[in-house]
Regions:
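Short runs of predominantly hydrophobic/aromatic residues within well-ordered alpha helices
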Residues: 115, 157-160, 205, 209
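Short, charged, surface-exposed loops that flank catalytic or proteolytic processing sites
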Residues: 150-153, 173-175
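Acidic, divalent-metal-coordinating active-site segment for phosphoryl/phosphodiester hydrolysis
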Residues: 152-165
Length: 232
């Protein structure tokens, strides 16, 4: 028998996609990632346009400015994502559940860290300095971080990384600690967003809770908490 194969240490990747829109099936038009170490130092980065093999919705084009002509000669998602394959990856990003719905099937995902969930947990506005929502641009402005080509994949990966660094620094946390904590879902007690924001989860209408679960675009903490309330 040959010698046992050693476990491969997962890569740490901050990832973002720009897409064809929100209508399924959703395609990727731009893919970017920044590979980091546990000290959140950048090791390398990657950015490419992607041929989604479907039409780009006008609303999506209005956000990222990527046209059908721009992606006509670009690699497909299966081709573009190959450099991340062949090893497990911890995937980090803002609302990373959305990106993983699209690209997760191409990856060996060891775990994920969502900066949207971290911002909801740790960032609190005040009457003098309100935090209106937890969108990436809003959080960046709230933290006085530099604007890095918003709504383009590589710019958003660097902004997500800066948000991660800032939250961890301000709260005395390490990436290693966050990864270990994120491995287990956190039980939420109040609705973090939307028309029922701030309401005790058990008081949110059952139909709305089930609709959220069916939408399939939730961070793991909220999905776990909703399923605890309604195991069916």
């Amino acid at each position: 028998l040959g010698a046992p194969v050693a476990d491969i240490e997962p890569s740490l990747v901050v990832l973002d996609t720009e897409t064809t829109g929100l209508t399924a099936p959703i395609g990727v038009v731009e893919l970017a990632w920044v590979r980091i170490n546990m000290d959140m130092e950048v090791l390398d980065e990657f950015d490419t346009l992607v041929n989604p093999e479907r039409d780009i919705e006008p609303g999506a084009f209005g956000v990222h400015g990527i046209s059908q002509q721009d992606v006509a000669g670009a690699p497909t998602l299966a081709e573009a994502i190959q450099p991340l394959q062949g090893q497990p990856v911890y995937v980090i990003g803002h609302n990373i559940a959305f990106d993983l719905r699209i690209v997760g099937g191409h990856l060996d995902v060891a775990g994920d860290v969502c900066t949207l969930a971290l911002s909801r947990q740790y960032l609190k506005g005040t009457p003098e300095r309100p935090l209106l929502n937890h969108k990436l641009t809003t959080v960046r402005e709230f933290l006085d971080l530099p604007c890095l080509d918003a709504h383009r994949a590589l710019g958003d990966t660097h902004t997500s990384l800066n948000v991660l660094r800032r939250i961890l620094h301000d709260h005395g946390l390490t990436l290693d600690k966050i990864i270990k904590r994120q491995a287990k879902p956190r039980l939420l007690h109040t609705m973090p967003f939307g028309k029922h924001a701030g309401l005790t989860l058990s008081l949110v209408p059952l139909e709305y809770r089930r609709w959220l679960l069916g939408a399939g675009n939730l961070d793991k903490d909220l999905a776990y908490s909703l399923r605890k309330l309604d195991p069916q």
